[in-house]
Amino acid sequence: MSKADKTLEKILSATADANIRFDDVISLMPRLGFHLRIRGSHHIFTRPGIEVLIDLQPVHGKCKPYQVRQIRDVLIKFNIAL
């Protein structure tokens, strides 16, 4: 199981939203078909066919819990997987 698989599993399990590393999510999102745009500390992910923007900012090397929930909601709603 790769690191991306483990990160995706953590996100989808909804048990560790406050404990997911920012760098792991940043490397996972392009593998899921998202495109990255950086504006200051904001890492903005878009994907063709999805109107929702995913805007992430690091806090002490981790993702904010509400942003992890946003990622999970988008992945489930649009049936996105590795």
For each of these PLM feature ranges, what is it?
Residues 28-54:
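A short, structured beta-strand/loop element
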